[in-house]
A protein has these predicted regions:
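Fungal secretory targeting signals
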Residues: 1-20, 262
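Low-complexity, Ser/Thr/Pro/Gly-rich disordered linker/stalk regions
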Residues: 17-173, 187-188, 204-262
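Low-complexity, flexible helical/coil segments
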Residues: 149-153, 194-199
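Short polybasic amphipathic segments
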Residues: 158-160, 193-196
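Localized edge beta-strand/strand-to-loop motifs within extracellular or lumenal beta-rich domains
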Residues: 174-193, 199
Length: 262
């Protein structure tokens, strides 16, 4: 029965799949140490790895089959991305981020940025700090978690989708619940749309389209987390964030959690 189910899932994924422009699913990596093969002088692999703390790569990024969304049979493993008090890069912000290494046109026409995200029950993220997640440098669209500047109160456990700094969708982020996300970005018409599901459920259009200044040079989307400091309300201790099924496609949107064959 398992074999039949896997075959059906594969066929469904194949039928619905678009064209993968960039594959960031970690399928070809043996460990996170492979990230250190990349440098500005030697731009190899699928990720640029330079936004992190001073520790070893294993302090900030680790890979394992147990870190992926188990509903995604197209991904061999997922990533645990950690931020802590040592994860500072050119500021007092806590940051561990990976950037696509590609010459593909991931900033042209209509493209779909896929990823799944969760946190666990260990090293739980601080709800009193603003987290910018899977963002573009111009912040025309991104996720946020925790208390966001301008909100009332001192904490917020919602995961929010933002467009130009404005919240367009939110849900409580519970431990060990996968949130599957697609940013549908039309760089030609300057619009963004949000697709979402949980667990192994099919993605559905959830919010948008909204007009936005969709500016990107093709090397400024950050997979990972940036945490802003907040005097008097800073959380303490490391935070673990999990990412799975990361890729960018064009053409027909893959709405299945089962990511397609590259």
């Amino acid at each position: 029965m398992f074999g039949k189910t896997a075959l059906v899932n594969a066929l469904v994924s194949a039928v619905s799949a678009g064209t993968i422009l960039w594959d960031g699913r970690f399928n070809e990596m043996s460990s996170s140490a492979d990230l250190e093969k990349w440098s500005w002088a030697n731009q190899v692999g699928n990720y640029q790895y330079y936004i992190h703390g001073s520790g070893a790569v294993s302090k900030y990024v680790n890979l394992s089959p147990s870190y992926k969304n188990q509903g995604d049979t197209g991904s061999k493993q997922g990533a645990k991305i950690t931020i802590d008090s040592t994860a500072k890069w050119n500021s007092d912000m806590w940051r561990t981020e990976l950037i696509p290494q590609t010459k593909a046109a991931i900033n042209k026409g209509t493209v779909f940025y896929h990823f799944s995200i969760k946190h666990g029950t260990t090293n739980v993220p601080s709800a009193t700090n603003e987290h910018q997640i899977c963002f573009f440098e111009s912040h025309f669209t991104e996720l946020k978690y925790g208390w966001v500047n301008g909100e009332s109160g001192t904490s917020n456990t919602n995961l929010q989708w933002m467009v130009g700094g404005q919240s367009k969708w939110k849900v409580e982020l519970k431990a060990d619940e996968w949130h599957n996300v697609v940013y549908e970005i039309n760089f030609s018409s300057n619009q963004v749309t949000f697709w979402h599901s949980t667990g192994n459920n099919t993605l559905v259009r959830t919010a948008g389209p909204f007009s936005s200044s969709t500016s990107s040079n093709g090397a400024d989307w950050h997979l990972g987390v940036l945490r802003l400091p907040r005097q008097g309300n800073d959380g303490t201790g490391a935070e673990d964030w999990f990412f799975s099924g990361t890729y960018i496609e064009s053409g027909t949107l893959t709405t299945s959690v089962v990511s397609p064959t590259a």
